[in-house]
Design a protein with these regions (language model features):
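Positively charged n-region of N-terminal signal peptides that target proteins for export
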Residues: 1-4
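Bacterial N-terminal signal peptides
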Residues: 7-16
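Sec/Tat signal peptide C-region and signal peptidase I cleavage site
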Residues: 17-21
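N-terminal "mature-domain start" segment
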Residues: 22-86, 119-134, 138, 214-215
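A short, solvent-exposed beta-edge/loop patch
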Residues: 25-28, 45-47, 132-212
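Second-shell loop/turn segments in exported
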Residues: 32-34, 90-98, 186-194
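Sec-exported extracytoplasmic/periplasmic mature domains
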Residues: 43, 47-53, 98-102, 108, ...
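A short acidic-to-branched-hydrophobic micro-motif
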Residues: 77-113
């Protein structure tokens, strides 16, 4: 769930929502069954007709004491590919924890005040390196479609040869049983379409429910 608070700003001015780092990461005891569950939850190209597929989302090293997850254990994780549709980019990621207690602890840390502050600091630094600026990062309303659901929106500006551009990145996080999944939707010039976000989130939530049934 640490990946909820990480946004790597891309050359396209759209951010992705996945990252892992060595320091503060959960312990890894990956099992084939939970790894398969994590992969089954991801957004697929067939979910986005007319999209083009890119590389998996990049990793970004970061550390915030309030998000230290070294006392928790992951048993599966997956990092999805990026998909582009017009000015919109979509990415997804998933994690399966050893226990519901670990999953709950990770969720609370990432969605609490320290998690949001970590995201603001990290995103601000990354944008500054690319001649950009973070305008705001805030929680936005989103319907509950899983055991737990939360969404955030980052608004940012960047300087391009064509002038200043505003970009928006929404991160929707879901928790089901021992699993977390994030869907990241980025868009330049206008906010991401809510109908598309709902479609993707409901699709992932259904896959999570199927993958975690009996687990």
């Amino acid at each position: 769930m640490r990946r909820l608070v990480v946004f790597a700003v891309l050359a396209t001015l759209v951010a992705t929502g996945t990252a892992l780092a060595a320091r503060g990461d959960p312990q890894r005891r990956i099992t084939p069954a939970d790894e398969a569950r994590a992969k089954a939850m991801l957004v697929r190209q067939s979910d986005l007709p007319g999209s083009t597929a890119g590389a998996p989302t990049p990793n970004v090293d970061f550390y915030c004491p309030g998000l230290d997850a070294s006392d928790l254990t992951l048993t599966g994780d997956a990092n999805g590919r990026r998909f582009a549709v017009g000015l919109m980019i979509v990415a997804s990621a998933s994690e399966v924890y050893e226990s519901r207690a670990d999953a709950g602890a990770a969720w609370r840390r990432a969605t609490g005040a320290e998690g949001v502050q970590c995201a603001k600091s990290l995103l601000g630094r990354q944008l500054a390196q690319q001649r950009g600026r973070l305008v705001s990062l805030r929680q936005i309303p989103f319907p509950r479609i899983s055991d737990r659901t939360i969404a955030f929106r980052a608004t940012m500006t960047a300087t391009t040869p064509q002038g200043a551009v505003t970009a928006y990145v929404d991160v929707i996080a879901l928790m089901r049983s021992r699993a977390h999944a994030t869907i990241t939707v980025g868009s330049a010039l206008t906010t991401p379409p809510r109908s598309e976000e709902l479609h993707l989130a409901r699709t992932v939530a259904k896959r999570m429910a199927n993958a975690m049934r009996g687990a």
